Amino acid sequence: MTRRHFIGFSGALMGSALLGGCGGGDDDAPASTTGAATPSAPATPADPIWGANGAATNIIASLNGITQSAFRAVDYPVEAYGAQPCPVVAQTSPYTDLTKSPVSPGAGATPGAGAFDSRPAFLAAIAACSAAGGGRVVVPAGSWYCAGPIVLQSNVNFHLSANCTIFFSPNPADYAKDGPVNCGANGNLYYSRWQANDCLNFGAPVYARNANNIALTGEGPTSTLNGQAMTPFAGSGNTATCWWTYKGSSGAYGCAGSSTPSQAYTNPNNVDLKTVAPGISSALYTLLTNPTTPWQQDQNYLPALSEAGVPVAQRIFGLGHFLRPCMVEFIGCTNVLMENYHTQNTPFWQHHPTDCTNVVIRGVMADSIGPNNDGFDPDACNNVLCDGMVFNTGDDCIAIKSGKDLDTEYGAAQNHVVQNCTMNSGHGGITLGSEMGGGIENVYARNLTMLNQFWATNSLNIAIRIKTNMNRGGFVRNFYVNGVTLPNGVSLTGGGYGSKLLTGSPINATVPLGVASATAGNPSASQGGLITFDCDYQPAGDAIRTRPALVQNVNITNVTASNVTLGSATGSCFQAIVAQGPVAFDYNGAAPTPAIPAITGVTISNCDFGTPVAAGPASTTTPGPIYAWNVNGITLQNVKIAGQLYNTTITDAR
């Protein structure tokens, strides 16, 4: 592989033959002399990340006070405020295509008709607890129905007992009936973020804003928050409407196609951008109304409002729109604890703290496989510990974010530690991005078991993932991963972005998947890579592409992946490393085009990546185990791929 525009290797590929003469001592070495002075061994340098005064250790230490014992030792039982348990009945999914509409855990039960709404009692107990100086609001064992958001207040620990399930109303109207902002026909809404863009929208089932010292806790996996996002609230049969219908995936969860109201349908309630942003320039208006990203769709309209500089108070969604709320969303809060409970059937992202400082999430099971059901998405937060979580998700297990488009007012996501977690299924095990406009820095991860438990039917797509594009921009700095075990590998099937790539781009689907030639490439960036750097994430989905991303100082060590056999394929992944740097073609802003930085400063060491399906030599028609485009030095040290040892540097100048 000597082509400058494929992968430039410098260094050595080491096999067992290289070690053939090293079985004994050196015949020319001087004999030891009895009684001679022995030089002192050099001191072992302290681990700068996990050592006693390491960066990650200091973050963990700074969060030692975020515990349940920090709350006043006074309980407020919700039954004392009028809460009543509800009967539960069996529920059968109306959706018959289980390939497109798989049944999520917890979807087989729902409160019986006429169930008592305990939400007023929950809110009354929270208010009393906070007013008295704080304590613990306790929901006892049993099943409870809640028709709207549980809004936490300062100094309150909202606690689910063992064998306690709160079933939230599946009806979107219940999350727009009494929020703090009266938005007329759109309902009474909540300040929120949807895919890292600020807006007024449906309230999250568990919500807080500008609160201090709050906790959501339980006693293990039987303490359950069930969002009932798969439970229909209208219609019947295969066209019944539930929260997940709003994704707009044809044939999935009641979506019959483009005419079904969803985030991806032409919404007549979205007014022309010149009306809502009268000062918009003609150049910006042209970009935002490009038919490739139809502005009338809610999923494109909100980013367009951000790019046009429309104030958040005028970005009104809720009723008449189709942007799903997160399950747990805390905004602008300090000292946040989420511990020892179980989420199921969530409308959107399962946990979304935004602009929060001092966040601990520990022992939580994120267990929902619907569309966009990420497990934990801290957004522009500072000082975060994610410890001992278990993930079974419909999207990324962990995705660290920091705003999108012009919504980067909260700055970077920084000082995060992720440790001791298990990833059973999902798109990415640990992901940075894609919404990372404010940047991401100082992220430390260790001891992750990416079990990929359902590898035969619902495989983990990627283990370690960075994703951004010319719209998201931002930066990744100081990302350290140490110790990832993948006993069942990741997806053996590669996957690219197809129609989400830009027409005319050198990155396009006419190139065989996983191949980079001197002039074109097609990364397997959506699935199949153990480690994926993707700086060209679905570029056709964004109208504005003017912000190149910077990825630098990434260190990954001690990753071990084992092979599995699925059908005729045996392997640990499709490709071991997928490194797609920024693509200059994507830029669509004013001239001149800014500098387009390559991925730089990456070290991968002491890893055994098993055997990729694409294990053979790379060519212009056949993928090899490594894909690289616009990369300035990925150093491999003691990295084994398909039995071959790599000590080399990967470079691909563009």
Go through the PLM ranges and name each one.
Residues T2-N157, S161-G332, E339, F348, ...:
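Extracellular "leader-to-stem" segments immediately downstream of a signal peptide or signal-anchor
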Residues G23-D26, S434-M436, K467-F475, Y497, ...:
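Glycine-centered low-complexity coil/loop motifs and glycine-rich tracts
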Residues I126-C129, C146-Q153, W349-D355, G388, ...:
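Short, T/G/N/S-enriched strand-turn elements that build extracellular solenoid repeat scaffolds
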Residues G134, A147-G148, S169-N171, Q228-A234, ...:
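Short glycine/acidic-rich loop motifs that flank beta-strands on beta-rich extracellular proteins
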Residues W144-Y145, A204, N373-G375, D405-T408, ...:
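Short, recurring structural edge motifs at helix starts
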Residues A162-N163, N212-S223, T334-Q344, T357-S368, ...:
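Right-handed parallel beta-helix
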Residues A380, S402, L432-S434, I466-M470, ...:
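Active-site proximal loops enriched in glycine and acidic residues that flank catalytic Cys/His/Asp
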Residues G567-F574, A579-Q580, Y587-R654:
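Predominantly polar beta-repeat domains that present long G/T/S/D/N-rich surfaces used to bind, process
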